[in-house]
């Protein structure tokens, strides 16, 4: 990502991965070590914390089973978040108010330890956030592009 695509490191999660950016946003992608390659979640930026809450509550009104994790605030990027399952069952994040890095030379990446790599406040993440329930199926190739 850094050499081939020109991403810059914003912060590291000790022993697990790195927050990378290709814009002024604190991070555009988080790359983590895992037994197989997979997409953990997509994220959708909204205007402010009120929109994070309204969007999540609207979805949860008819589908409370889609709640994953939130409302909270990440330490890395300082953005507000709420994670939900989209209609296909994939993790999606509503977020707002992410830090920006307007000048690369003024930014020094930090190494975040433990839960600091995940969040500053809010409820703790559920086990399925840290180890997706379908990870075993991914590892044996049970998921495929053809369904």
Where are these regions (language model features)?
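Short, charged/polar, Gly/Pro-enriched secondary-structure boundary elements
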Residues: 26-30, 90
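Core segments of cupin and vicinal oxygen chelate
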Residues: 1-27
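Vicinal oxygen chelate
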Residues: 44-147
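Active-site beta-strand termini and strand-to-loop segments that position acidic
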Residues: 20-24, 34, 85-87
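A short, sequence-level motif marking secondary-structure junctions
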Residues: 34-36, 99
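His-enriched metal-coordination microenvironments in redox/metal-binding proteins
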Residues: 27, 36, 74
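Short amphipathic alpha-helical segments
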Residues: 38-42
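Short beta-strand
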Residues: 10-13, 32-33, 73
């Amino acid at each position: 990502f850094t050499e081939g695509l020109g991403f810059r490191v914003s912060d590291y999660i000790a022993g697990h991965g790195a927050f990378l950016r290709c814009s002024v946003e604190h991070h555009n992608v988080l790359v983590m070590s895992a037994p197989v390659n997979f997409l953990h979640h997509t994220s959708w930026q909204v205007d402010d914390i009120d929109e994070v809450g309204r969007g999540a509550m609207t979805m949860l009104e008819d589908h409370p089973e889609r709640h994953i994790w939130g409302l909270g605030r990440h330490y890395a990027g300082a953005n507000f978040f709420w994670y939900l399952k989209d209609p296909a069952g994939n993790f999606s994040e509503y977020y707002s108010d992410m830090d920006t890095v307007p000048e690369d030379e003024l930014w020094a990446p930090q190494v975040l330890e433990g839960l600091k790599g995940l969040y500053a406040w809010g409820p703790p993440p559920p086990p399925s956030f840290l180890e997706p329930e379908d990870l075993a199926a991914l590892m044996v190739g049970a998921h495929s592009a053809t369904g």
